[in-house]
Amino acid sequence: MENENLKVEQATTAENNMAEKADDSKASKEVKPTIVSREKLLEAGTYFGHKKSMWNPKMKEFLYPQSKRGMHMINTNVTLQRLEFAYNILNKFVAKNPRTTFIFVGTKKQAKDTIKDNALRTGSFYVSERWLGGTLTNASTIFKRVKVMEELEAQAAKKFQGYTKKEGLIKQKELDKLHKNLDGIRKMQSLPSFMIVADPNVDAIAVKEARSKGVKVIGILDSNSNPDAVDFGIPANDDSAKSITLIMTILADAIATARGGKAKFAYQGDDKVILPEFKTDKTLNPRFMNQRRSFEQNSAEGVKTVEKTTTSTEVAE
């Protein structure tokens, strides 16, 4: 009788173990949510590169082997992988170091708005107009300009009392210019830990200053970019306002959520990832829209992807 009970008990245990393994196997097969859907990457036009004649050969591993109408296409699978990697790096770093400082940089027209918006919501510094040479390498010069701005602010508060109308207008014009260039960095007393840049080519001086001072640089890499120019790059279209907005917002989400805030785009449903319309956005140009439709149709049939990626790059220890 005891033997029979033992056999029953063993059989029950074995059955339970098998059930547990089945549950574990089922759980392991569940698809993890992606940081952003591929559909949104396509909607934002992140895959558009430049003409083949303008490419940087160092970007080869981030591009589809095929080109469309003489233009390189950026591998959206690599974009997704490296975007999520950058998100995790920033999120974990800020979680461990809450006082980490950032500077968002994007002086081209397509980047200005999202650079400023995401910097403000994360309490970061930003430059969305002109990068003043020496911003990171010659702080004393910047401090002097900030002091001049503060003096003019004091005079403006008194409506430039003691000055003629013409002199007052000249001073107000100077003050407006200083605000435009310095508002995003006026409180920066020390070097930021990270620079997040929309276009390393356009803002090459900023990137060079950052790397010379040990500031880690994360940037968008278009097909004409040099991946060696930054510490970590995310291959994507840097000429589309939608593409820049999508990438910058997700990177800002990494900072915001690490500090207890809410994400706007990262790991959100497509219905919440609402990309603004830009009249200057090339993805709205009919010529590019035809290329986009063609690409979407072909990608569904299995466009070859680039498997070789560099995910072991360390941005920060």
UniProtKB/Swiss-Prot annotation:
Record-stated family: Belongs to the universal ribosomal protein uS2 family.
Biased composition (Basic and acidic residues): 18-30
Molecular function GO labels: structural constituent of ribosome
Keyword Transcription regulation in record: no
Region annotation (Disordered) ranges: 1-30, 293-317
Gene Ontology biological process terms in this record: translation
Protein name per its UniProtKB record: Small ribosomal subunit protein uS2
One GO CC term on file: cytosolic small ribosomal subunit
Gene3D superfamilies in UniProt: Glucose-6-phosphate isomerase like protein, domain 1 (3.40.50.10490), Helix hairpin bin (1.10.287.610)
GN (gene name): rpsB
Compositionally biased spans, kind Low complexity: 308-317
Pfam family, one: Ribosomal_S2
Keywords, in A-Z order: Ribonucleoprotein, Ribosomal protein
